[in-house]
Amino acid sequence: MPDTVTALQFVNMEDQYIYDAAISANSYQLKLRNGTYEVKAEAGDYQTVSHIVVENQAVARDLLFLTTKKEKLEWVPDIYVGYDQKEHNYQTVREAVKACKAMNPSDESKRITVHIAPGVYREQVLVDTPYVTFINDEPEKEVLLTWYYGIGYEYYSIGADGYYSEAAAYDKFEKNTAQKWGAAVYIKNTATAFRAQNITFESSFNKYITDEELADGVTPGGPDIKNFERTKDSDVASGEATERASALAVEGSQSEFYECRIVSSQDT
């Protein structure tokens, strides 16, 4: 836990009774009766979205704390994903996009180019910052940005807003349905002048099942519930399984795509 955590409370979700945890050396301890609990914390610039279920036995549960502080970074024209020897390198595209936002480019002269190393990046990416470019500098190899959400299903990792949430993915407490047909990459209306070059955008939903999707607890649900169970052996490319699932959603003006592939099945 962060050093800034000064109080932890576990609230019984049935009767709202509050239990206070004893905090010591970045750990916590308390006694709870059977039930489901929401965790609330006093943690400075951090917050947690966590739940614990107690059923007749001791429970050990690490809590995920995420910073609420708005990061500011000095602007640089180039950042990298998957290039470990490079300065300003990030391990995921999502982290790189977050860094772009922290640099806050205000016009074309402050454009940030995200150089993405060839490989598979299984993550939902939301771009809400203007003047950002995604580029694959090795076009003979593929940069694949892919994700698995689709209409008619619920997933643990979807937050209340309908998009991937790191906190919800870790908590695995309740499921939600996707917005924008589960777009693998969503260029929001604030992301003016987005560019991509030599990138493949893919929705795997109607193509193949991933271990990550199964681990995310995919189940039929939502207002457009689909009467088809998605399992390791399911033929998700069949007509029976096909549903709306977008590889790319674009609302930002002046978006440009060069030598890109956009791959899905229904409503790409």
Where are these regions (language model features)?
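Short, surface-exposed beta-strand/beta-hairpin micro-motifs centered on an aromatic residue
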Residues: 24-32
